[in-house]
Structure formats: structure tokens, C-alpha cells
């Protein structure tokens, strides 16, 4: 059965580094071996901000204040489901890092991020985050291979 999955993704930034999660602890993880930001699936009734705060707390032990929404990602039929992902960054947080149940947490220098084993789409949308451009993008994969993508940069002024 094909489902629509809502999720969040957050890149926590501090002193020229980004907190990344090396997904190595769960053998059946669709992201096993990849480096990702933090985040995960919505629970019933959550807003994107509530979801990203809960997921970051669960995965890292950090409590976010004022996460900033940067864009929306859509991955149609990715591993059998349609994924809609709200992408955030955060620079304001408290707490101490825990031993994550999802993988190994590490602060990575921003200039070294693209050298990590990332999903191909991450290489494309990282610059949009750094440029501060709000984006809405669709990335289509066949297996683990990115086949096509499209992006819009909607005007976000009110």
C-alpha cells in the first residue's frame, strides 16, 4: 500500500558547523550509511514546529527554540511512499547531546558537509538553505538514484 508521509528535517548550526546524524544503528533503516540532519515523522495533531522540536529532542537531547522553516521537499514514491518534508535550521538550542538511538551524532564543519555520504538531493538543496531562499522542490528517485528534480522559489513576503 502506498502512503503519504509527513516529516521534518532540521540542520542545527553552531560556530560554522552543522550537527549531522550518521545513520548506522538500525539495520533496516532506509537511510543506513547516510548522513542526515535530524528529524522524523509527524505524530497525530502535530504542527511542523512541534514535530521538529520533538524529533530533535528525541534524537539528540537538544531543545530547539525558534526553528526556522526554509522549504518543503517532496519525494514521490520514495521507497514505496510519498514523502513530504518540512526543512528547518536552528541556531538557538539548549541541552547536552545524548547517545542517539538513530545513529552517531557529530558536528561537521560546513565546508566539509558535501564530502559526507549524503543523499544526492541534499547536495542540491544545501545551497538554497545557505542562501536563505525559501524553496519548494520535488526530487524523484529510482531506488537510491536521483533521476530528476524541479524547484520553485516562491515569494514569501506578506
Predicted regions and their residues:
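Short, active-site-adjacent segments that bind or coordinate small-molecule cofactors and metal centers
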Residues: 129-148
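Conserved N-terminal beta-strand and adjoining loop/helix that marks the start
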Residues: 1-20, 41
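A generic fold-level signal
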Residues: 5, 13, 29-30, 80, ...
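Short, charged/polar surface micro-motifs in flexible loops or helix N-caps
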Residues: 13-17, 26, 91-96, 132
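N-terminal first-folded block
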Residues: 18-30, 34-44
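Recognition helices and adjacent regulatory flanks at domain boundaries
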Residues: 3, 17-19, 28, 54-58, ...
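Unchanged
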Residues: 42-65, 75-128, 149-158
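Catalytic phosphate/metal-binding cores of nucleic-acid and nucleotide-processing enzymes, i.e., regions
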Residues: 71
